[in-house]
Amino acid sequence: GSRGLGDVYKRQTIAFALTQKSLFSELVLIDSNHAKAEGEAMDLSHGLPFAHPMKVYAGDYKDIADCYLIIITAGTAQRPNETRLDMVHKNVEIFKSIIPNITKYNNSAILLVVSNPVDILTYCTIKLSGFPAGRVLGSGTVLDTARLKYHLGQQLCVDSRSIHAFITVSY
């Protein structure tokens, strides 16, 4: 199965997308606020009759023992006038608390980091987990590229799928 950890809005979006594909049989949401994760899991489960069969529930780190993909969305929200780099120290501290819990229960999964600043936190995850770099992936600039393509499509009045532009550096 796939497991999700962290930021509620990113987690909800990713979890919803995962329920739309038949890639996984199980999805567990882990949050320091277990009740919040339970509510999200229930909401997602109620939508499953329109998607693919899947077990969705709120869990704990012990529930990641047999998974092969762990998606990490943990981190603080970006505040007004705060850059992604301003968030580094706070998010590194969060990662110092969750990565050891992940590796305690599973040292063979692929880790996908989508927290910001993603490049720095992906590197941090490699170092904290001791996993080979090939098993720790970051979403990089995919979202920034999608936003650029959307806005260019709007400005140029063309389908954004026809835009071939990429953001290649974090900011």
Q: Where do the language-model regions lie?
A:
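Single conserved hydrophobic/aromatic residue that forms the stacking wall/gate
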Residues: 1-5, 9
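Residues forming the Rossmann-fold NAD(P)(H) cofactor-binding site
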Residues: 12
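Conserved N-terminal Rossmann-fold NAD(P) cofactor-binding segment
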Residues: 26, 30-68, 82
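Redox-cofactor binding/interface segments in oxidoreductases and associated redox assembly factors
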Residues: 70-72, 113-114
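Conserved NAD(P)H cofactor-binding loop of Rossmann-fold oxidoreductase domains
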Residues: 74-76
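Substrate/ligand-engaging "lid" and interaction regions
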Residues: 149-171
